[in-house]
Amino acid sequence: MKLVIVKDYAELSRKAAEMLVSEVKANPKTVLGLATGGTPVGMYRELIKLSQAQSIDYSQASSFNLDEYVGLSSTHPQSYRSYMEENLFNHINIPAEKTHVPVGNTTDHLAECARYEEAIRLAGGIDIQVLGIGNNGHIGFNEPGSPADSLTRVVQLTDSTIEANARYFDSVEQVPTQAVSMGIKTILGAKKVVLLASGEAKAEAVRLMLEEEPTADVPASLLQLHRDVTVIVDQEAASKLTTSILAGTKPSGS
């Protein structure tokens, strides 16, 4: 795992956006794995700026999102489809039919999960997967205890995750209790992974991810099993890392 520590959230967002732009410039048919939540918002903002400034063409690219809430339609304002359209898809020329988000309000979740896995396979797999990290170490909605061989499935959200996401809803009672999420094995199947973490609240999760042995109790630690992971954190998110980990840090700007 390559660790890159940057000054702040703004620099983190720029570096992550630059990585995605580089992928698309090198391979116009790049398959992007995308994340939602608070952390990637700045990255998407920077990605739009870079794409417009450099006339980046996404017409041959495609994307797969990590997850979607169970029970929300794609047009619900808090659905992850709506999030992606607002924060990215409506601002670049990626074809709508090539942007994939799990369907959360289907009547057959098993079939939807199988369909999603097959769609990823038919696309040739994900070239670069963007991740955030939860305070409890979750990636996607793979909560602690998620097995390393898990595929896309319906997951039960923990109370801490529901409470963390309540800020996007009018009340905690409105937050869905389940989600369709790519599994750990699905995520590890990406050719490259870039994980972003910002703020002191993520510092302990970052420490556990990087310093503990891979364990299902800290889903993000299972990324140690992947051959090409870049972890970009700001100084606050890196504040609990030990000297031995920091000794191997890739300097910002290199």
Swiss-Prot record:
One of its GO terms (cellular component) is cytoplasm. It is an enzyme of class 3 (hydrolase). Its EC number is 3.5.99.6. The active site is at residues 67, 136, 138, 143. GO terms for biological process: carbohydrate metabolic process; glucosamine catabolic process; N-acetylglucosamine catabolic process; N-acetylneuraminate catabolic process. Keywords: Carbohydrate metabolism, Hydrolase. GO terms for molecular function: glucosamine-6-phosphate deaminase activity; identical protein binding. Pathway: Amino-sugar metabolism; N-acetylneuraminate degradation; D-fructose 6-phosphate from N-acetylneuraminate: step 5/5. It catalyses: alpha-D-glucosamine 6-phosphate + H2O = beta-D-fructose 6-phosphate + NH4(+). Catalyzes the reversible isomerization-deamination of glucosamine 6-phosphate (GlcN6P) to form fructose 6-phosphate (Fru6P) and ammonium ion. Belongs to the glucosamine/galactosamine-6-phosphate isomerase family. NagB subfamily. This is Glucosamine-6-phosphate deaminase. It comes from Brevibacillus brevis (strain 47 / JCM 6285 / NBRC 100599). The gene is nagB.
